[in-house]
From Swiss-Prot:
Gene Ontology cellular-component annotations: cell outer membrane; pore complex
UniProt subcellular location: Cell outer membrane
Protein keywords: Capsule biogenesis/degradation, Cell outer membrane, Ion transport, Lipoprotein, Membrane, Palmitate, Polysaccharide transport, Porin, Signal, Sugar transport, Transmembrane, Transmembrane beta strand, Transport
Domain of life: Bacteria
Periplasmic side: 23-33, 68-83, 128-135, 159-161, 189-391
Protein name in the entry: Capsule polysaccharide export outer membrane protein CtrA
Signal peptide from the UniProt entry: 1-22
GO molecular function: polysaccharide transmembrane transporter activity; porin activity
Extracellular side: 44-57, 94-117, 146-148, 172-178
Gene: ctrA
Family the entry assigns: Belongs to the BexD/CtrA/VexA family.
């Protein structure tokens, strides 16, 4: 019996010695906090591989404000279309002349209408010079004028030639003051009228969203400025439903947002969230929180590709000096120390983005426990077997 215990003791010592040398081979759910932090500590001579940023109130507020700026209210409410004419518009012109008709007694499309003689001119396209042509009047400049103003001009010029002329000008095809509305499977050009069309009118013009409302974003492009708002926010907040302007492009984007949770969080999973967005505190709640026995509260990380222009100014200079352009996306790791109570406030302002990876590192004590379990499980099992044989 003494020999058996002696052999077991020596087996334990030999196994411990061999496993301590190769303890890095212990299975783990991911890198430790120390290894992740070392990613941002590259030599100054080399191009840095990762931008490591500690999340504090200032960093969280900057990211929060950048998200808030994705608002249609930044464009201003604008104004309704004045209904003025422009190049490419098509006009319908009708002329009435009291009998006896002097100018429009025949020829063009004409008919009697009571005691007046009615003449319908062929549809007139506003030329590149901004004019339309009317018989006996000649070319008339119409760009920037309303149909009512144009008909008064024609009527005034015909008075000296026709018998009590009356004129009606109608816009039949608005090719200039319109908005492009783009959606998968259905895109239209929506004309703007004096009624004042808004963003939700454009959404309705293409039949709304083909997906769930919470998975749909609405993007508005005006000139060189692009803003994106969740359809949920657009419906819930009337201030976002601004008036559209000539040349605007409204695009409906259907793309379910997700982030991936990894590390000491129970199991790796992809978690969906609304296009309205998600804060880091909400994301950790959806992950089920941190595991008390495994996770390192000081090692909560968010991995994402961040546009260079969204980094703090002093950090942008470092990357620009290494040859990165303004359009580059920088691999960035945001570190959160949840052991600090202040971080709980920062996390409520820190926005999670589509395709983010949230990683929780293992606590050092959890690694020790895993190591001890890995070492002593086979020895204990072997000892039990030997004891059974001895008995």
């Amino acid at each position: 019996m003494f020999k058996v215990k002696f052999y077991i003791r020596h087996a334990v010592l030999l196994l411990c010695g061999s496993l301590i040398v190769g303890c890095s081979a212990i299975p783990s759910s991911g890198p430790s906090a120390k290894k992740i932090v070392s990613l941002g500590q590259q030599s100054e001579v080399q191009i840095p591989e990762v931008e490591l940023i500690d999340v504090n109130h200032t960093v969280a507020q900057l990211l929060y404000k950048a998200q808030i700026n994705q608002s249609f209210t930044q464009f201003g409410d604008g104004y309704a279309s004045a209904g003025t004419l422009n190049i490419g518009d098509v006009l319908d012109i009708m002329i009435w002349e009291a009998p006896p008709a002097v100018l429009f007694g025949g020829g063009l499309s004409s008919m009697g209408s009571g005691s007046a003689h009615q003449t319908k001119l062929p549809e007139q396209l506003v030329t590149a010079r901004g004019t339309v042509s009317v018989p006996f009047v000649g070319d008339i400049s119409v760009v920037g004028k309303t149909p009512g103003q144009v008909q008064e001009i024609i009527k005034g010029r015909l008075k000296k030639m026709a018998n009590q002329p009356q004129v009606m000008v109608r816009l039949v095809q608005n090719n200039a003051a319109n908005v492009s509305v783009i959606r998968a499977g259905n895109s239209v050009r929506m004309p703007l009228t004096a009624a004042g069309e808004r963003v939700l009118d454009a959404v309705a013009a293409v039949g709304g969203s083909t997906a769930n409302v919470q998975d749909t974003n609405v993007q508005l492009t005006r000139g060189n400025v692009v803003r994106t708002v969740a359809l949920e926010d657009l419906v819930a907040n009337p201030r976002q439903n601004i008036l559209l302007r000539r040349g605007d492009v409204v695009t409906m984007i259907t793309n379910p947002y997700t982030f991936t949770s990894m590390g000491a969080v129970g199991r790796t999973q992809e978690i969906g969230f609304s296009a309205r967005g998600l804060s880091l505190s909400e994301a950790i709640g959806r992950m089920g929180g941190l595991q008390d026995r495994r996770s390192d509260a000081r090692g909560v990380f968010v991995f994402r590709y961040t546009p260079l222009v969204e980094l703090p100014a002093e950090r942008q200079d470092k990357w620009i000096a290494q040859g990165y352009g303004s359009e580059a996306e920088i691999p960035t790791v945001y570190r959160v120390n949840m052991a600090d109570a202040h971080s709980l406030f920062s996390m409520q302002r820190f926005p999670v983005k589509n395709k983010d990876v949230l990683y929780v590192s293992n606590a050092p004590l959890a690694e020790v426990q895993k190591f001890l379990s890995f070492v002593f499980s086979p020895v204990t099992s072997g000892a039990n077997s030997i004891n059974n044989l001895t008995n």
